[in-house]
Amino acid sequence: MGGSESTGRKVSFGMDEEERVRVLRGVRLSDEVVTRMKDQSTWAASGAASGSATVPSKVGSSASHPAAASKDGAHKPTAAGVGHQYAEEDLYRRYEREQTLIQEELARLAKREKDAAHQRLSTSILREKKMADQERRKAEHLPADLDEWAKDLEHKEAELQNLNTFYREQLSSIEKKNLEIYRLTEEQFHTAATNAELRVKQRSYDPVCMDLQSNILKCYAENKQERLNCSDLAKEYQKCVSAAQKNLLFNHG
């Protein structure tokens, strides 16, 4: 009973007030085992009582036939000796039954602990296997992801290169246009300046009203304190200048 796991196991147990095993190695027996032990102890006690009741009847019969006893010449055991021997045998059988129950309880506890440990180990193994599968799948997808990332980078680099080329071409075109505009503007400026200079040189003007101008200057010099004396000359000079301007506008209009 108990299997190979309980063979050779040293068990220490304690007895309660009714001399029944209750605790072994700090492990308390279950109620089911205690109930079975109680039932078997009750059965053993009833068997011992019936055995002790039958012993005196045998003794009485032997006493009623002393001649037969003496005739055989054999020594018969007394009732007390027979009862003591039966009690020892019953105690031994009780001890064996209790040992069997203890071995069964130990086997049950060992099996429960083994199952719990196996369950924990299985859960841990499954968790580690799941994590390993996840890492493996990540590792399998990683090269494909790297290739895709590399392609994306190449595509973006190509787009940037195209944009750089486009902007360089646009900048070069703008610089060329600006240079052409500058040259054209410079040519137009020089042409306009040359034409203006030619027009100015072609027009030569003689002084107008020179006589009146000389008379006014002379009058002002002679009449420094009384400038009003030269007012008539000034009016004539203004009329002469106005007439000369009109003639100039009319001739070049």
From Swiss-Prot:
Residues 206-248 form the CHCH domain. Disulfide bonds join C209-C240, C219-C230. A lipid is attached at G2 (N-myristoyl glycine). One of its GO terms (cellular component) is mitochondrial inner membrane. Pfam families: MIC19_MIC25 (PF05300). The keyword Calcium does not apply. Residues 38-82 are annotated as: Disordered. The keyword Membrane applies. Component of the mitochondrial contact site and cristae organizing system (MICOS) complex (also known as MINOS or MitOS complex). This is MICOS complex subunit mic25-b. It comes from Xenopus laevis.
